């Protein structure tokens, strides 16, 4: 009998140890507007831009391609498809920058990335990786807009 009682208490303790608690601050309307799941997360595509095989010697051409790259970044951000973008510092991996795209599939991400003139010209190669992150990440752009003094 003592063993049965001890087992029962141990079992109940284990059940409560793994129980989930609800967040008192949860806003279902906000979560739905962000496309959040029950954990406040959603799927994105993480893009790593790497040094590509093309070497563009002509400065005017290179400058034009990078201007197009920046214009494309701004367009995608304006369409709420690009959530985060930025360059990496110098590194041995030949990683040049990253994007986080608010799309559901790798195929959608490929379509968007291929609109970048620097990618099309093979200045950059890309790696596309499914990524699961905070659905609130899109709020980052609103704050970034308020603290950016000079735009590209």
Question: For the regions a protein language model found, what residue spans apply to each?
Answer:
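Conserved, structured core segments of small domains
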Residues: 20-152
């Amino acid at each position: 009998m003592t063993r049965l009682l001890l087992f029962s208490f141990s079992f109940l303790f284990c059940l409560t140890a793994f129980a989930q608690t609800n967040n008192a601050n949860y806003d279902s309307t906000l979560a739905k507007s962000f496309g959040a799941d029950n954990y406040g997360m959603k799927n994105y595509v993480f893009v790593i831009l790497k040094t590509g095989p093309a070497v563009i010697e002509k400065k005017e051409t290179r400058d034009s391609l990078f201007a197009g790259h920046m214009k494309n970044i701004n367009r995608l951000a304006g369409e709420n498809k690009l959530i985060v973008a930025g360059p990496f510092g110098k590194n041995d991996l030949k990683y040049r920058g990253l994007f986080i795209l608010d799309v559901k599939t790798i195929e959608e991400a490929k379509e968007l990335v291929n609109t970048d003139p620097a990618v099309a010209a093979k200045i950059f190669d890309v790696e596309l990786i499914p990524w699961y992150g905070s659905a609130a990440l899109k709020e980052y752009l609103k704050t970034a807009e308020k603290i950016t003094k000079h735009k590209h």
